[in-house]
Amino acid sequence: TKKMSEILKAEDIDKALNTFKEAGSFDHHKFFNLVGLKGKPDDTLKEVFGILDQDKSGYIEEEELKFVLKGFAAGGRELTANETKALLKAGDQDGDDKIGVDEFTNLVKAA
């Protein structure tokens, strides 16, 4: 499995994480842009999804979403409950309370 820093620039990851280091400040639109995901090909987005899908279930569940920033770098903070729910709501198009790979790529593209 690749590391996030092999897919995206380390300085972009750091900048994005620093921008949202305050609890409650997370905005997935801005984050995906800052971190350099916007405009990346589907294959790259799928690799990123694979890193964030910690249990390799094919979905990012709410519990994993909480750690989404840590997926980009170990120093990332945990999302608050409200931030996690907002991200889930934004990404979950079919209402199954988790984000599949296609939902994830759509979420990034909509950012």
Swiss-Prot record:
Q: Which residues form a coiled coil?
A: none
PROSITE patterns recorded for this chain?
EF_HAND_1, EF_HAND_2
Where on this chain does Ca(2+) 1 bind? D53, D55, S57, Y59, E61, E64
Q: Which UniProt keywords apply?
A: Acetylation, Calcium, Metal-binding, Muscle protein, Repeat
- Binding-site residues for Ca(2+) 2, renumbered to this chain: D92, D94, D96, K98, E103
Any matching Pfam family: EF-hand_7
Cellular component per GO, a single term: cytoplasm
Give the molecular function GO annotations: calcium ion binding
Every EF-hand domain range = 40-75, 79-111
UniProt modified residues of type N-acetylthreonine: T1
The known PTMs are summarized as: Acetylation of Thr-1 converts C1 to C2.
The record makes one more remark, namely: Isoelectric points of C1 and C2 are 5.4 and 5.0, respectively.
Tell me which family the UniProt entry assigns to this protein: Belongs to the parvalbumin family.
Biological role: In muscle, parvalbumin is thought to be involved in relaxation after contraction. It binds two calcium ions.
Q: What name does the UniProt record give this protein?
A: Parvalbumin alpha
